[in-house]
From Swiss-Prot:
It comes from Xylella fastidiosa (strain 9a5c). Keywords: Oxidoreductase, tRNA processing. The gene is trhO. The keyword 4Fe-4S does not apply. GO terms for molecular function: oxidoreductase activity, acting on paired donors, with incorporation or reduction of molecular oxygen. Residues 128-222 form the Rhodanese domain. InterPro entries: Rhodanese-like_dom, Rhodanese-like_dom_sf, TrhO, TRHO_N. This is tRNA uridine(34) hydroxylase.
Length: 257
């Protein structure tokens, strides 16, 4: 059996998140999907797995809602469903940053495409000859599985620790073009906005994150795999899962709790 795994997020105003959660739960259960959907007033964040027809039908239904017509979905395949359950949760944020003054609903920070970034990585500078710094917005557990070559990493265990950890390195970044990246892009939607509001106007976000980069240009300039928060553990640049049973067992325990 071939399972389709999807990841998607969209920042959009949702005035009745619980109503939407109930609708998504009903459609997802009927389709036999597994995974997690987070909904907040600021938008939606989805990690879902299922058979091809069920996945296609679910996203066709969801994207028929004008609020989600622009939803961009990333796809990969596996031989099993990497999630044990189907969960739909209403949260204060679809990605916790705890900076109430930062909202992608008010406008996105500028980004760089995967193809352009690959060219910059080859040259070691941007189109204006300015040195390039890759800034990893993920935590240390994720980074251990792989990151961009020479990337700046921060000693954080949670995304909410990003602003405090970055403060020690700001002076080192003042003369560079900084490209912030994460798994699929959602964390950088907030991190880069915060950095620019905080006076760092030389920062961009990698459109689509690491997984989008893998999908579009492969693994050039990247060392290792990309950690994902499910039973696949990590994906290589061809989006193939890693089988690390120690981590799978740990994930299974967290799913039960």
């Amino acid at each position: 059996m071939v399972i389709i795994n999807t990841a998607a997020y969209h920042f959009v105003s949702i005035t009745q998140p619980q109503t939407l959660a109930d609708q998504i739960r009903a459609h997802g259960e009927i389709a036999g999907l597994k995974g997690t959907v987070l909904i907040a007033n600021e938008g939606i964040n989805l990690f879902l797995a299922g058979e091809k027809e069920a996945i296609n039908a679910f996203y066709a239904w969801l994207c028929a809602d004008v609020r989600f017509a622009a939803l961009h979905v990333k796809y990969s395949v596996s031989a099993y469903k990497p999630f044990a359950r189907f969960k739909v949760k209403v949260r204060p944020e679809i990605i916790s940053f705890r900076r109430g003054d930062i909202s992608p609903l008010q406008g996105r920070a500028p980004g760089v495409s995967a193809h352009t970034l690959r060219d910059w990585l080859r040259r070691g500078c941007d189109d204006n000859g300015r040195r390039l710094v890759m800034l990893d917005a993920r935590n240390q557990q994720e980074i251990a599985y792989g990151t961009f070559s020479g990337a700046m990493t921060l000693p954080i265990t949670k995304f909410t620790g990003f602003p405090g950890a970055l403060a020690h390195y700001r002076d080192l970044l003042s003369d560079a073009t900084v490209v912030s990246f994460c798994t699929g892009g959602i964390r950088c939607e907030k991190a880069v906005l915060w950095m620019r509001v905080d006076g760092m106007d030389n920062v961009l976000q990698l459109e689509g994150g690491i997984l989008g980069y893998f999908e579009q240009v492969g693994g050039e300039g990247y060392d290792g795999r990309c950690f994902v928060f499910d039973k696949r553990v990590a994906l290589d640049p061809q989006l193939r899962p890693l089988n690390d049973m120690r981590v799978v067992a740990s994930f299974a325990r967290s799913e039960i709790s």
